[in-house]
């Protein structure tokens, strides 16, 4: 089974373009057939035009977020008192995802800023159940991602066991786990064993080398030659998000694809 790679435009081509629309064009020009994007606040029409112009697949969209609030800039799904905001952000993101034919939304959790963790868990679970119903009506999937404390200190969703417990409580087949191997290695190590343990829950993958989050072929803790073969054996046939920080420039770093025996 051939692996398929999508350019994460929060990380790639940022040195050449500030707008998401222009990054989409650059990704297409450099061989990517799919992209992952944040909710494009203020440029939705331009992004829709760029997607139609290039024909790229939008494989993942991040939930809209509030840039003006330190706690909510990483999402609102788990944050008590933000339920109304979450629903409006969810509706806006689903509407945008429809326009670009994207079937998958990353339901970002937000930051834990004190109080009772049980309140965050209750809010998160309730909001994910709401999301499951809304996404199902649009034939979409929602994913949740455990993120390590070095990348985003205080992020609520910070372990695979916590994610598994939440998903069990939500009990919706269209709310799944996003396995970012960069975060997974930081959080738990033993990537292949952890993936096998949570295999049934995973609906999306992202990649980057550890510890510096560069390209997969850069020297680091993970052997991506082995990892990619494991993903093929895993049977995953969706897009794999390239959510890494280019060591030099995006284009100069794309040699990893052919070096590891793949194509875009």
From Swiss-Prot:
A single GO BP: glyoxylate metabolic process
Protein's name according to its UniProt entry: Putative hydroxypyruvate isomerase
Catalytic activity entry: 3-hydroxypyruvate = 2-hydroxy-3-oxopropanoate
Family of the protein in this entry: Belongs to the hyi family.
Species in which this protein is naturally found: Drosophila melanogaster (Fruit fly)
Enzyme Commission numbers on file: 5.3.1.22
GO terms of molecular function: hydroxypyruvate isomerase activity
Top-level EC class as recorded in UniProt: isomerase
Pfam families assigned to the protein according to its UniProt record, in alphabetical order: AP_endonuc_2
Known function: Catalyzes the reversible isomerization between hydroxypyruvate and 2-hydroxy-3-oxopropanoate (also termed tartronate semialdehyde).
Keywords of the record: Isomerase
A single Gene Ontology CC term: extracellular region
Active site location: 145, 243
Lineage: Eukaryota, Metazoa, Ecdysozoa, Arthropoda, Hexapoda
InterPro entries to which the protein is assigned, alphabetical: HyI-like, Sugar_Epim/Isomerase, Xyl_isomerase-like_sf, Xyl_isomerase-like_TIM-brl
């Amino acid at each position: 089974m051939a692996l398929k790679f999508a350019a994460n435009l929060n990380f790639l081509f940022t040195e050449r373009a500030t707008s998401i629309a222009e990054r989409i064009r650059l990704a297409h020009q450099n061989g990517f057939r799919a992209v992952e994007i944040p909710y494009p606040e203020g440029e939705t029409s331009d992004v829709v035009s760029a997607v139609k112009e290039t024909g790229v697949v939008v494989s993942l969209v991040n939930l809209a977020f509030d840039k003006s609030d330190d706690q909510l800039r990483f999402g609102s799904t788990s944050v008590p008192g933000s339920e109304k905001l979450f629903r409006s952000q969810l509706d806006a993101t689903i509407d945008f995802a429809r326009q670009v034919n994207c079937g998958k939304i990353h339901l970002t959790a937000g930051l834990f800023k004190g109080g009772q963790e049980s309140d965050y868990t209750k809010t998160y679970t309730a909001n994910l159940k709401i999301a499951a119903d809304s996404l199902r009506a649009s034939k979409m999937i929602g994913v949740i991602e455990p993120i390590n404390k070095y990348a985003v200190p205080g992020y609520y969703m910070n372990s695979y066991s916590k994610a598994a417990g939440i998903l069990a409580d939500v009990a919706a087949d269209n709310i799944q786990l996003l396995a970012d191997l960069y975060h997974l290695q930081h959080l738990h190590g033993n990537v292949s064993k952890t993936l096998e343990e949570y295999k049934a829950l995973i609906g999306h993958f992202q990649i980057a080398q550890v510890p510096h989050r560069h390209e997969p072929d850069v020297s680091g803790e993970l052997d991506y030659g082995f990892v990619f073969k494991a993903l093929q054996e895993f049977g995953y046939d969706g897009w794999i998000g390239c959510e890494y920080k280019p060591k030099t420039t995006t284009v100069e770093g794309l040699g990893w694809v052919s070096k590891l025996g793949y194509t875009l």
